[in-house]
Amino acid sequence: MAKDAITGARTRFGNQRSHALNSSRRSWKPNLQKVTVKINGAAPKKVYLTARTLKAGLKNGSIERV
């Protein structure tokens, strides 16, 4: 299973609850994107990042897309 290379985000599991509070298992998957980036000026590398991590990294300058 893939995970975010920076934050380590991966699939989370929990319960889906109906109006009657019946439960069934469900999962929440992160929005993973496979991108080629330079992280802190290192050599370009293909990694999985969540859209949220990618957006934040591009904004603060720690990630550069190649």
From Swiss-Prot:
InterPro entries: Bacterial_rp_bL28 (IPR050096), Ribosomal_bL28 (IPR026569), Ribosomal_bL28/bL31-like_sf (IPR034704), Ribosomal_bL28_bact-type (IPR001383), Ribosomal_bL28_sf (IPR037147). GO terms for biological process: translation. SUPFAM superfamilies: L28p-like. Residues 1-26 are annotated as: Disordered. One of its GO terms (cellular component) is ribosome. Residues 13-25 have a biased composition (Polar residues). It holds the Pfam family Ribosomal_L28. One of its GO terms (molecular function) is structural constituent of ribosome. Keywords: Ribonucleoprotein, Ribosomal protein. The keyword Zinc does not apply. The keyword Ribosomal protein applies. Belongs to the bacterial ribosomal protein bL28 family. HAMAP family: Ribosomal_bL28 (MF_00373). This is Large ribosomal subunit protein bL28. It comes from Leuconostoc mesenteroides subsp. mesenteroides (strain ATCC 8293 / DSM 20343 / BCRC 11652 / CCM 1803 / JCM 6124 / NCDO 523 / NBRC 100496 / NCIMB 8023 / NCTC 12954 / NRRL B-1118 / 37Y). The gene is rpmB.
